[in-house]
Amino acid sequence: MKILSGREKAEQDLKQLKKELDELNLNRPIKLAIIQVGDKMESNRYVEQKLKKAKEIGIEAKCFKFDENITQKRLLLAMDEINENWDGILIQLPLPKHLPKEVILDAVPYEKDIDGLSHRNEFILYNEKNSDDKFFVPAAARAVLELIEHHEINYKKKKVAVVGRSHLVGKPVAHILKRRGASVSTFDENTPIKLVASADIVIVAIGVPKYIKAENIKQGAIIIDVGTNYDQNDPSVIFGDVDHESVKTKASAITPVPGGVGPLTVVCLLKNLVEIYK
């Protein structure tokens, strides 16, 4: 079974991105603001990775961390101030349940919405033939697509199953692959999982540990596991959304967790940020 690593490409792309930044010859560093509400361990880890990689290539990045119980009104007021002074703005998800996610995401100015999750950005992404406006592909979705291209996975006229319909991964990946010539079917927890078994390529981003097992895939299937799930008893242990031990006798190739889509996601976020200036 071939391992579809994303680490090497992530490091190469980060070096290339630094070179592009240097060539832009800006009179100040590009500035990235990360807005985090609460203190979830998983969110803290993701934020640390983003801050670290941004610093490596000369981007000025800062996390604005707010109390878990902050009101919608106070958060939006704080965001108004942040919007004035930062080039790219990212809302670290998930948000606490009392905050309406769509309202908070739409409070990020469209041109600074580097994770591409505002309604306006999504409208342009899914209707791009009718618009000349610039849009951002959500970083995790872009990472999946770039990893597929990097490993020269042929998806045109192939059956592709996208398990998970989130705005972060499943929905944009399915839309773009379909537009590029793949035969795409989408699934969620309410869809009969047995239908995945006919797919040549299975992309899994459903947020459920070890959701896909050997009996759910065909012999020789290529698996892209986007899931990152931390063991509650041992936070150093990470599971994907695929049971890797189970599928290893049937899959022809799979992305590792960690080390597959994850490293590329951070780099793709920074690519979106730098593209503001291109």
Swiss-Prot record:
InterPro entries: Aminoacid_DH-like_N_sf (IPR046346), NAD(P)-bd_dom_sf (IPR036291), THF_DH/CycHdrlase (IPR000672), THF_DH/CycHdrlase_cat_dom (IPR020630), THF_DH/CycHdrlase_NAD-bd_dom (IPR020631). Its EC number is 1.5.1.5, 3.5.4.9. It catalyses: (6R)-5,10-methylene-5,6,7,8-tetrahydrofolate + NADP(+) = (6R)-5,10-methenyltetrahydrofolate + NADPH; (6R)-5,10-methenyltetrahydrofolate + H2O = (6R)-10-formyltetrahydrofolate + H(+). The keyword Hydrolase applies. Pathway: One-carbon metabolism; tetrahydrofolate interconversion. HAMAP family: THF_DHG_CYH (MF_01576). This is Bifunctional protein FolD. It comes from Mycoplasmopsis synoviae (strain 53) (Mycoplasma synoviae).
